[in-house]
């Protein structure tokens, strides 16, 4: 049920459930603080991350067509956004991974140009960063795989119904490493990364592949099939 308050332009949504109900109000309170503001049961959380998973919603817009033919980054963002809603701890782990990755890339850039620290010191620091990157990356990839096990059968069944079985859809997680293998991969490519001056492996370089009759949809899917 949606209600519109024309005077205050404040839509409200109410979804009944047993034995209680949840009401969400979107608008501009009279005493709102400057900038972004959110509250749950009248109490504002100390951090925005605490709201993850509080307001699950399914939104479709034309930009979502890029999930099929766009860059892998968009598909990774799709996965990570869904997982932040499902698992409250995912966002914190993801942020830690990104922070360590940024530190690693900064170190690798300096290594490639010969700036700052001695080479041996850079190698030691790189090993420390890779250890943390592997720990966070393994946990995040596991969550991604678990989510796809739930999503793929439903998505493929829905597509089969829409296409009347004209073609078969499948979803595959294109991983750079098997579960438990990220630490070894980082060690194997450490020298290559030092020469390249950038990170070359990790979950930030993986992809979600959508296939139609075992062919990549990003190459062969029509506009209608993408929708």
For each feature predicted by the language model, list its residue ranges.
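Extended, highly charged alpha-helical segments
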Residues: 62-138, 142
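Conserved NTPase motor "head" modules and their coupling/switch loops across ABC/AAA+ ATPases, GTPases
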Residues: 10-14, 115-227
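Nucleotide-state sensing region of NTPase/ATPase domains
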Residues: 1-74, 79-86, 90, 152-157, ...
